[in-house]
Structure formats: structure tokens, C-alpha cells
């Protein structure tokens, strides 16, 4: 049996219903509403409305007692949300209409004065900015904790050597801690990006009205201070209601953070695989196979890698929504919010899971050491001749000849004698034996940012100094 169509909604009871006589198609009601996802902004919407009520009183539009009644009424609405007692009713199109409807039920007609000079265009932008400031600060604390775990492990495990790769081919000897700090350096840049975008997020649109400004001379600087918007006020009312740069910037920063975490996860997925066996995820962050009893799959890492694609998709989605929209507010903008919510929620989960994986990860130094091979010292062999005055371009050729000699003989560089090497260049002498030392190879890279023990510990200390300076001990 076909389901009966819902009755059309009465537009005359809506906040915007004054010029309407017809009713809204029920499907359009559902299509248009945003309350199912924007109700999570109830606290920010109430906070913004309380600040606006105070500004109206300051401008002489509300009497003092009216402003107090509205502010206290909004506090009661907030208590209902906190207690899970707020009742959503038909016609509550979004969080703004829901809160205003309930306020008017509680305080009477004076509640209808709250929206004086205000549009949902400047209200919604304010709510999202206010919410996003808090979320970015939480993201920063989560990334900071991940960086702290990386720094602590790097210091504790600084003696561990492992193969370094380029093109996923054997390259040079590095410290495990150097590899880990390479990712922490990327996370630090991510944190800086989040920090740097905060002032642009924390810029106040409220007081811009629908597009042309507020005719009641509300003090926008006062509102910005009330709401803690350190970026001041949006300088142009048309831009204020149309600007969604803060969404794109945040989703981009989140997307790049997820790219970095995806690359980190990919490395660990490779390092945990059978042929490598350098690391093993704890049981808390791995799963098994329904068929193969021996399997321990790095699902947490694979999901981190996969969710990076999801967040990148959100970035493309937001940009596609905004492209081609005419100046000032358009309903298209509503489509940005779910993408923003999903991005923020995903990043919170991804960073926390990454921190859990890293803090419980088991490393296998013996397997890492076993992965070191003689060919990874070929560059050191070239540098040996450099120190004897031979130009590097020549030494590179001579070292390559040694590698080829070993390959042709089916042996390693270690197996070549001094006499063998002398046939390549006469400056090879008995002291070349010192080259065949993986720890020495790492220690020779002692410049700032290098893989020597001193340099890696310096990187750790610099990261801790950064975290302390940013208040992320």
C-alpha cells in the first residue's frame, strides 16, 4: 500500500511566512531543513544570541530588563539542551528557529525582539565560526599530544638503526627516531596551519544583517569581545555573510594533516608486513581474519590511510559548492556544513587513533638491523674518497663501480678487499674498513636535521620547546 503523503506545512507560522499564503510541500520541508545536523550548534547559537541581546540593549533597542529577560530565557533553553529535554517541534527549520521559538514560549513576546536587525545570514556564519574556533583548538591539542608521543619515543629509542628508503628502495642508514621525527615535523606544520587560520575563523560576521549592515547601530566590536573573537569583525557586510573561506581553510588544513597521517600510516603498514617485520601494532589497534587464524591486520593504520581520502573528498565538495555562487548568501552554503562536521569529526578520530597506535606500537630493533645491507654504505664509500680530495662526481662513479663489481661476483661490498678497491681507485687503503659501519654512517650525518644521535635529540628538544611555547606540554 502506498504511504499517504504528509500534509503541506503552514508557511504563515514560519519566521519568514509574512508574505506567503500557500503551504510548503512536505518533501520541500525536509529538503530545506538543517536542524538534523545543525542542532549540535545549540550552545553557540545561544551564546551568540545572548551577546546580541546585550548589544541591542547597549544600542538602546532593548530595555535593560528586556535584555535580562532574553539572556536568562536563553540560559533556560541551554539547560534544556544540556538535560536532553529540549523538544524539537514541527516547523523548527534549523537551530536558530528552534531556539528562538522556545525562547518566545518561555519569555513571551519580548523574545520576538531578539532578532531585531539580525538575519540568519549573519547568525549562521557566527554560529559556525564560534563552533569552529573551539574545534580547531581541540584539534591542535590532539595533534600536540601526537607530537609529544613521537618526541618521547624518539628520545627513548634513539639508538635504534633502520634502513632508510627512497623510491622504496634501500638508500641509507637512518635512526628509527629520525624517521619518526620526520613525520612529527610534518605534524608540526599542520599544527602551525591550524594556529594560523584561527584569527581568520575568529572574525565576527554578526551585525552585518542579511547583507547591507545593521540599521540599529549595534556595537560589533562589543559583540566580538563578548564572544572572544580575537580576529575582530568582518570589515564588509556583504562579504561577511558570503565568506566561507574559513570553512575551506579549515578543511584544507585538516585534509593536509590527513595526507601526512596517511603517509605515516602507509610506512607503518609496510614496516609491519611479513617481509619487513620492523613493527607490530598492539592488539588494541589490529584485527584478525575470519578465515586465516595467523593474521594480524593493521586495520587502524589502513583506516587512517582511507579516511584521508574521505577528508580530501570533503574539501573538493566544499569548493564545488561555493564555486559559481553569486555574491552574498545563497542556500547552497547549507551543503558546506555537513562536510565540515564530517571533516572535523573524522580528524578528531584519526589523530586520536594515530596517537594510540604510536604510543602502543612495538618496534623490533633486531629486524631493523637485519634489514641494513652493505649497498646502503655505497654513498659512504664515495664520501671516503671525497675526504681524500677526489671530486664527488668522480667518487660517485668509483663507488658505483665497486657496487657493480660486487654484483658481478655475487657478493656484497663488505666482501671486496682493499686490493679489489684499489683496482678502482689507488686512494683506497686499509682505513676504508671504517666505512663498513652502519652506526658510523648515521653519526657522520651530524648537521642540523641529520640522522646522527646528537642531531635527532636536538630535533626532539626543539619540538618540545615548540610544544611548550604553544602551551601544549
Swiss-Prot record:
- Recorded family membership: Belongs to the lyase 1 family. Argininosuccinate lyase subfamily.
Q: What class of enzyme is it?
A: lyase
Matching HAMAP family? Arg_succ_lyase
More about this protein: Often used in tagging mutagenesis schemes to generate new mutants.
- Write down a Pfam family by its short name: ASL_C2
Protein source organism: Chlamydomonas reinhardtii
Q: Which PANTHER family match?
A: ARGININOSUCCINATE LYASE (PTHR43814:SF1)
Active site, renumbered: 167 (proton acceptor), 289 (proton donor)
- Protein name as annotated: Argininosuccinate lyase
For the ligand (2-(N(omega)-L-arginino)succinate), the binding residues are 34, 121, 166, 297, 329, 334
Quote the NCBIfam families the UniProt record gives.
argH (TIGR00838)
Which lineage ranks, top first, belong to the organism behind this chain? Answer: Eukaryota, Viridiplantae, Chlorophyta, core chlorophytes, Chlorophyceae
Amino acid at each position: 500500500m502506498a504511504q499517504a503523503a504528509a500534509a503541506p506545512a503552514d508557511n504563515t507560522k514560519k519566521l519568514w511566512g509574512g508574505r506567503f499564503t500557500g503551504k510548503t510541500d512536505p518533501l520541500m520541508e525536509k529538503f530545506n531543513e538543517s536542524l538534523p545536523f545543525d542542532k549540535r550548534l545549540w550552545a553557540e547559537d545561544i551564546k551568540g544570541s545572548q551577546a546580541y541581546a546585550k548589544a541591542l540593549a547597549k544600542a538602546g533597542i532593548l530595555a535593560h530588563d528586556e535584555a535580562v529577560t532574553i539572556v536568562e530565557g536563553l540560559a533556560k533553553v541551554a539547560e534544556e539542551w544540556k538535560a536532553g529535554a529540549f523538544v524539537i517541534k514541527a516547523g523548527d527549520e534549523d537551530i536558530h528557529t528552534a531556539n528562538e521559538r522556545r525562547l518566545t514560549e518561555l519569555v513571551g513576546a519580548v523574545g520576538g525582539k531578539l532578532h531585531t536587525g539580525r538575519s540568519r545570514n549573519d547568525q549562521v556564519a557566527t554560529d559556525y565560526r564560534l563552533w569552529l574556533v573551539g574545534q580547531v583548538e581541540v584539534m591542535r591539542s590532539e595533534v600536540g599530544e601526537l607530537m609529544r608521543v613521537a618526541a618521547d619515543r624518539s628520545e627513548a629509542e634513539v639508538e635504534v638503526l633502520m634502513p632508510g628508503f627512497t623510491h622504496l628502495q634501500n638508500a641509507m642508514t637512518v635512526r628509527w627516531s629520525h624517521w619518526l621525527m620526520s613525520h612529527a615535523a610534518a605534524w608540526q606544520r599542520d599544527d602551525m596551519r591550524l594556529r594560523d587560520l584561527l584569527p581568520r575563523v575568529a572574525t565576527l560576521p554578526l551585525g552585518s544583517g542579511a547583507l547591507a549592515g545593521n540599521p540599529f547601530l549595534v556595537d560589533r566590536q562589543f559583540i566580538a569581545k563578548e564572544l572572544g573573537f580575537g580576529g575582530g569583525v568582518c570589515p564588509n557586510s556583504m562579504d561577511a555573510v558570503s565568506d566561507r573561506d574559513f570553512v575551506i581553510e579549515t578543511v584544507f588544513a585538516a585534509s593536509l594533516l590527513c595526507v601526512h597521517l596517511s603517509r605515516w600510516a602507509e610506512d607503518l603498514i609496510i614496516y609491519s608486513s611479513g617481509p619487513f617485520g620492523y613493527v607490530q601494532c598492539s592488539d588494541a589497534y589490529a584485527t584478525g581474519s575470519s578465515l586465516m587464524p595467523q593474521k594480524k591486520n593493521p586495520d587502524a593504520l589502513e583506516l587512517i590511510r582511507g579516511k584521508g581520502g574521505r577528508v580530501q573528498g570533503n574539501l573538493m565538495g566544499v569548493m564545488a559548492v561555493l564555486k559559481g555562487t553569486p555574491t552574498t548568501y545563497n542556500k547552497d552554503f547549507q551543503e558546506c556544513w555537513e562536510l565540515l562536521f564530517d571533516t572535523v569529526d573524522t580528524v578528531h578520530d584519526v589523530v586520536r587513533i594515530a596517537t594510540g597506535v604510536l604510543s602502543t606500537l612495538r618496534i623490533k630493533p633486531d629486524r631493523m638491523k637485519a634489514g641494513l645491507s652493505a649497498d646502503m654504505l655505497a654513498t659512504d664509500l664515495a664520501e671516503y674518497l671525497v675526504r681524500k680530495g677526489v671530486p664527488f662526481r668522480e667518487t660517485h662513479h668509483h663507488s658505483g663501480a665497486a657496487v657493480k663489481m660486487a654484483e658481478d661476483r655475487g657478493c656484497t661490498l663488505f666482501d671486496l678487499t682493499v686490493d679489489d678497491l684499489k683496482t678502482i681507485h689507488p686512494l683506497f687503503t686499509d682505513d676504508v674498513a671504517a666505512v663498513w659501519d652502519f652506526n658510523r654512517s648515521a653519526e657522520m650525518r651530524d648537521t642540523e636535521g641529520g640522522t646522527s644521535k646528537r642531531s635527532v635529540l636536538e630535533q626532539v628538544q626543539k619540538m618540545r620547546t615548540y610544544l611548550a611555547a604553544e602551551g601544549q606540554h
